[in-house]
A protein has these predicted regions:
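Active-site neighborhood of HAD-like aspartate-dependent phosphohydrolases
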Residues: 10-55, 66
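Substrate-recognition element of Asp-dependent hydrolases with the DxDx(T/V) motif
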Residues: 36, 103-133
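Short, Lys/Arg-enriched N-terminal segments with co-localized hydrophobic residues
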Residues: 2-11
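Asp-based, Mg2+/Mn2+-dependent phosphohydrolase catalytic module
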Residues: 10-15, 51, 111, 125, ...
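Residues at secondary-structure transition points
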Residues: 27, 48-52, 56-59, 73-76, ...
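Metal-dependent phosphoesterase signature
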Residues: 66-105, 113
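Helix-loop "lid/cap" segments that line or gate small-molecule binding pockets
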Residues: 39-40, 60-74, 131, 162-163
Length: 223
């Protein structure tokens, strides 16, 4: 990792910037929490708090639900709960979800500079594409969510796929995310990671997980 005095100030010189979605470009936490609690209530399970759901996200919806149901829940019931969640979230993924402040101007500036952009997320593919289409149409070149044949983060498959699609080498790319999963994904792909502090994890988690840079605002990504 770079020395601490480099963490806040650096010059970005990349041909491609790849973003995580939840907690990085968009604040999806309320919709995720409400969908989780709807699914839990269908099985008579206790609800989860916003902070609990915050700590559970990052590894895909299956892990989210498996962490949300009571520990004694059978795999069969957990899978049924997962399906209820998927169905409900598909219809309610955009109720409160919105881009974080400063994201759209940052993406616009990247586009003006000719920088290619992509999203690699563990979110369900259809939901990810819907969010990108609604909020970032024209600003994201490739979106890869949870799809068959592409291993989820922290495996590097998604990053490798978009780099091939964009025609960009690893030494000209950077990954931007808000969690330890994102840091590990970038490391596994062999590219640097910019950790953002406005998402679902604390700055200390990002540093411990090996983030190469830390930014507190979207504007800092442009420096």
């Amino acid at each position: 990792m770079l020395p601490p005095f480099f963490l806040k100030r650096y010059i970005m010189k990349y041909d491609a910037v790849i973003f995580d979605l939840d907690g990085t470009l968009t604040d999806t936490l309320e919709d995720l929490k409400n969908s989780v609690n709807y699914a839990l209530s269908e099985f008579g399970f206790p609800e989860r708090s916003l902070e609990e759901v915050r700590s559970f996200v990052g590894n895909g919806v299956k892990k989210l639900i498996y962490l949300s149901v009571p520990e004694s829940t059978s795999e069969e019931t957990a899978e049924k709960c997962l399906e209820v969640f998927k169905t409900y979230y598909k219809e309610h993924s955009l109720v409160k979800t919105k881009p974080y402040d400063g994201i759209l101007p940052m993406l616009c500036e990247l586009r003006n500079r000719g920088v290619k952009t992509a999203v690699v997320t563990n979110k369900m593919q259809e939901a990810a594409k819907d969010i990108v289409r609604i909020f970032f149409d024209g600003f994201i070149d490739v979106t890869v969510g949870q799809v068959d044949g592409v291993a989820q983060k922290p495996q590097p498959d998604g990053i490798n796929y978009v780099l091939q699609k964009l025609g960009v080498s690893k030494d000209k790319a950077v990954y931007v995310g808000d969690s330890e999963v994102d840091c590990f994904t970038a490391k596994n792909a062999g590219i640097p990671c910019i950790g953002v502090t406005w998402g679902f994890r604390d700055k200390s988690v990002l540093l411990e997980s090996g983030a190469d840079f830390i930014v507190d605002t979207p504007e800092e990504i442009l420096k």
